[in-house]
Amino acid sequence: MVNASGDPVIEAAHIWSDTLTVLKHSASLSPREKGWLEGVVPEGVFGSTIVLCVDNNDTLQAIQGDLNDSLLQALRTVTGENMFPAFKVVPKTEPEPLSEAKPAQPYPSEISPTVAEFGKESYGAKPAAAPREPMPATEPQFPVGQQKMNRDPETHLNKNFTFDSFVPGDSNRFARTVALAVAEGSGQDFNPLCIYGGSGLGKTHLLNAIGNYALVKDPGLKVRYVTSEEFTNEFIDALQNPNQSQGQIAEFNRRYRQVDVLLIDDIQFLGGKEATLDQFFHTFNALHQANKRIVIASDVAPKNLKGFEARLISRFESGLTVDVKPPDLETRIAILRMIASMNGSKIPSDVLDLIAERFTENIRELEGALTRVTAVASLSNQPVTRALAEQTLQDFFTTDVEIKPTDIISQVAKYFHLTFEDLVGKSRTKNVAVPRQIAMYLAREMTSMSLMDIGQVFGGRDHTTVMHACTRISDRMQQKQEIYNYVMELTVRLKQSNTN
């Protein structure tokens, strides 16, 4: 889901991407003025302030001068409220430091316009002047973006997720021990290994750690990490061309049945997808009979998986099933210390205690809260204290209301003077087809549903129809102002209706 994490870095990236698009479509700005905006890099959102980095004072003066009013208006259009930019001058160095840590346009055309939920606290009610000196090199930088982007193109493993960076506690120690045994190749009795638990508790971390460790022990191994949606999409892609499907399916089978270690995440999303499950069943059997290692992660225990045949569930249960639970207080504090240590940040113990006491559900909450506190301290040039943390996090406890696909369909239908049935029905007339595509696009960007699940909501349409709709609207938003405006206004309405 877009902005589901509430992380200030990710929120800033989404907001700036949309703001830049608004400004590029502005007829009142000259090409030169639009050019000044290309080098701006978003750093974070704190209250009603968005921190933007520029690489020289000329750019800063241009944006704070002639472009200031246009920028404020664009931010208001995107977020639905008054936001104020604070600027930092961060000169470019050679070689450039980890460009993936602060992408200029992290999600260019695929992300729909978003409206973040901000607190009332503002850190800088007016556009702030740039600091006279660049921020020190020790400024805390949390690797949220890097973790998402540091993915090996062949194995799909995230190199940042290792056993060394996994903090054990009573809630996950047994799962870690078993995972390490599988990674070492000594856990044949645990094959397959099924790890289950709620979101943000470390399942994905463990899967990647297994793959990374296995490759350290034996670089010649063929390891592949894949989510269930990626597996589904690859299988469907292999079926697309009737003239070549046999060859493509054979290639798909080779790709997965020749691996030594298969790590599949979020297996629950395969539920009810009969053709994909049948393909996975045969892949599973081929690997298991060849004594290859299989590790599966799910949000529920195998016996509770919905839409799976008994024959597949029995195979999952033939190995070992372990769970991960929400971390206890001591483990949460240890996790926060690990995060701070990995980023060279010195955080007082009472601040770590405060965050650990307030955020109890999962690790993502902990990381997001710590990131927000350290970023606000850096921006305001203050030390990290318990008082600052209390103030910063006071609006962090509001739970975002998840937007349902039916809410999106209803809102889009109302906006275009159609009915719910029009959008989920079979009509292909232009006055229905375009709103339907917009609704599919919004469902993809504002919910956590897979393409196939979205298709089911829209009258049982298939994966490719939804994919085409999302691509079509994404492209047309860059070409037609009215399409962009439709998506923007609907996004604002959906956010407002779900927070009232």
UniProtKB/Swiss-Prot annotation:
ATP binds at residues 200, 202-204. GO terms for cellular component: cytoplasm; plasma membrane. It is found in: Cytoplasm. Residues 378-500 are annotated as: Domain IV, binds dsDNA. GO terms for biological process: DNA replication initiation; regulation of DNA replication. GO terms for molecular function: ATP binding; ATP hydrolysis activity; DNA replication origin binding; lipid binding. Its main location: cytoplasm. Residues 81-155 are annotated as: Domain II. Coiled coil: none annotated. Signal peptide: none annotated. Residues 156-377 are annotated as: Domain III, AAA+ region. Domain I is involved in oligomerization and binding regulators, domain II is flexibile and of varying length in different bacteria, domain III forms the AAA+ region, while domain IV binds dsDNA. Plays an essential role in the initiation and regulation of chromosomal replication. ATP-DnaA binds to the origin of replication (oriC) to initiate formation of the DNA replication initiation complex once per cell cycle. Binds the DnaA box (a 9 base pair repeat at the origin) and separates the double-stranded (ds)DNA. Forms a right-handed helical filament on oriC DNA; dsDNA binds to the exterior of the filament while single-stranded (ss)DNA is stabiized in the filament's interior. HAMAP family: DnaA_bact. Belongs to the DnaA family. This is Chromosomal replication initiator protein DnaA. The gene is dnaA.
